[in-house]
Each structure stands twice: as structure tokens, then as C-alpha cells.
Amino acid sequence: MISVATAECFTHGKIGIKIHKMACGYREFEKDPNYSIINGNVFVIASMFLPSKKGIESILDVKLPEPDYVFKYSKAYNQENDILVAKMVANALKNKLNCDIAISSTAGVGNGAICILTDKNEYNFTSDIYGDLIKGENILKRQDNGVNKAFNTFVEILKKEYGLK
């Protein structure tokens, strides 16, 4: 069984929850074309929504850079730093939980960033939607796109690295 953990910001834990529901055999997902790849092969150790710098640092024992923008209690970075922070969080998550696959997401101003870290590779990518957390622009569209893109990439990794079909 392949262990997975997520520490998500702009995707609000939805990547991990979707993987968990398929892994556990929720009936609503039985007709999904990826159901048989995940069910019986994957389990979720943790799926966390961590919007704050303090929460991430406390739970994962990692020191993040100072946010580029002030936004209520949440961290908000520019695109370049979102990519850096997604990598840092995925690495900290993998080290802390010793999972096979760690997934992290973060988004402030830009397309956001997602990192999927396996024992063999690091996959870094963004959503296809520009959003601005500070101004509240395209937040839900960016989130939906990020969740779908991360999930599809996760499935491709299962096929490529683990030979699942």
C-alpha cells in the first residue's frame, strides 16, 4: 500500500479528501475511471488544511520565509515564493510522516504552486488560473483547477512510478 499525506492551503484539503474517499471505497467514486488505481493501493495518513505560517511551522517543524503580503491570518506569497514554499512544505511533510507521497499546495498572488514529492521524484507545477488572494480574484476557479490538476498528476505518478493501471 502506498501512503499519502497532504498539507494544503489554497486547495483546502480537497486533494487529500478525494484520494481518501477513493481509497476507502466511497460509493460516489466507484464510477470514476481512476477508482481502481487508488482503491486497494493507496491510503491517506493525513490530509490537512494549513492556511497559516504558524500552523505549518508548528505541525511540520519547518521555518518558512516571511509572507510577501499581509492577509489576515493566512500566509500570502508571490508566485516565485509559492513554488519555494510548496517544495518546503512537501519535504517537511514527507520527513515528518515518512509517507511514500507528500502533496502540498499554496497560493497567494499568482497561479499558486503544488508540489508532489515521491521517493524518486519531485513534481512542481502551478494551477492554470491566475488568482489574487489579497483582492479575492479567481480564488475558487484557481482552487478547482489546482485540485483537478493535482489529482490528475497524482494518478499519472501512480501509473508511472508504481505501475498501477
From Swiss-Prot:
Belongs to the UPF0254 family. The lineage of its organism: Archaea, Methanobacteriati, Methanobacteriota, Methanomada group, Methanococci. Transmembrane segments: none annotated. It comes from Methanococcus maripaludis (strain C6 / ATCC BAA-1332). InterPro entries: HcgF. This is UPF0254 protein MmarC6_1720. HAMAP family: UPF0254.
